[in-house]
Amino acid sequence: AALAAQLGTTQAGTDHIGQITRVLNARLGTGWYETKEMPNDPPTPAQRDLLWHDIVFDIDRNYPLVANIVAPPGNQPPGYPPGQTIYHYFTVFGYDAVDRTVLIADPASFGGNQIYWLSFDQLASLIPPKGYSA
């Protein structure tokens, strides 16, 4: 409840990734996290490159990323309700540079899937038009 209050979360959710960035920095006593917007859908090559760079750079330094996603029918992580668009946040806390996949911790646990791998391409397609904290 205290974290939700700090985030300004209501029954309608948490409005903007910037709220996550602010609370992460306050709770960790750091200025590490920045809000990265991804307004273009599909994302530009530069936005995709920055996202991959942020994943590798941050995770290698023990800073997971938080992504604000929009998951419409046909482009959803495992277990998501198939007939609806889900607006959600999850954490990116690992990656595989060879396979270009990312490890997700998902607090919703749709279908019992709390930890799972996504392709980088799918992650990059889920974030627009929102953003992420890195």
Give short role names for the model-derived ranges.
Residues 2-134:
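Conserved active-site-adjacent core of cysteine acyl-enzyme catalytic domains
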